[in-house]
Regions:
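Extracellular adhesion/carbohydrate-binding repeat motifs centered on closely spaced tryptophans
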Residues: 1-192
Length: 192
């Protein structure tokens, strides 16, 4: 009786501990890898998405039939899959290279050249490469500031790298020019 991952007729198939063939499900073999087995043939699927037991969990299985992880370019989309192979949607993620990325809540596509809101009402801006920007940035007609974690600064006085002191509006985050603003300790500044 077959058990585990077996190759039959050039196709990988999976049999549970009782010897029953797994079909239409994701299974983890002894090698620790996740694979999806087609609901009709039972063959390991390749180059396709499959839904997990939880309806919100999606996986993508590469050419080798194994669930992909990390940043992946699939067609015209750049997507991210966590260490368990689940597609990440609607979240801010810090990658191994320390870059901060956001993946759309509906499509899972990486945000590029746009703002996205984090889980605690903080705002980020993602550049053309999909990385959260930091420091002083000119975006459209506005000059904005983002902290070292990529979060937009609003309603605060900030000392920039050049030692200049700037204030960023509490609503828009735009740098104050030609106006007074109150600091955190009731001190007033004029920004020209």
């Amino acid at each position: 009786m077959a058990r585990g991952l077996v190759t039959m007729g050039g196709n990988q198939q999976f049999f549970d501990q009782n010897g029953y063939q797994v079909k239409g499900k994701i299974a983890r073999a002894k090698d620790g890898q996740l694979r999806y087995f087609d609901k009709d043939s039972g063959n390991a699927a390749a180059n396709r998405f499959a839904q997990g037991d939880n309806p919100s969990d999606w996986y993508y299985f590469g050419a080798d039939g194994v669930a992909v992880t990390g940043l992946q370019k699939l067609g015209q989309q750049t997507l991210y899959f966590d260490q368990d192979g689940k597609q990440v949607k609607g979240k801010i993620v810090t990658l191994a290279d320390k870059s901060i990325r956001y993946f759309d809540a509906n499509s899972g596509e990486m945000a590029v050249s746009k703002f996205a809101e984090g889980s605690k009402n903080e705002w980020y801006y993602f550049d053309q490469a999909g990385k959260a920007v930091t420091g002083l940035q000119k975006i459209g007609q506005q000059t904005l500031y983002f902290d070292q974690d990529g979060k937009q600064v609003k309603g605060k006085v900030v000392t920039l790298a050049d030692k200049s002191i700037r204030y960023f509006d509490a609503n828009s985050g735009e740098m104050a020019v030609g106006k007074f603003a109150e600091g955190a300790k009731n001190e007033w500044y004029y920004f020209d």
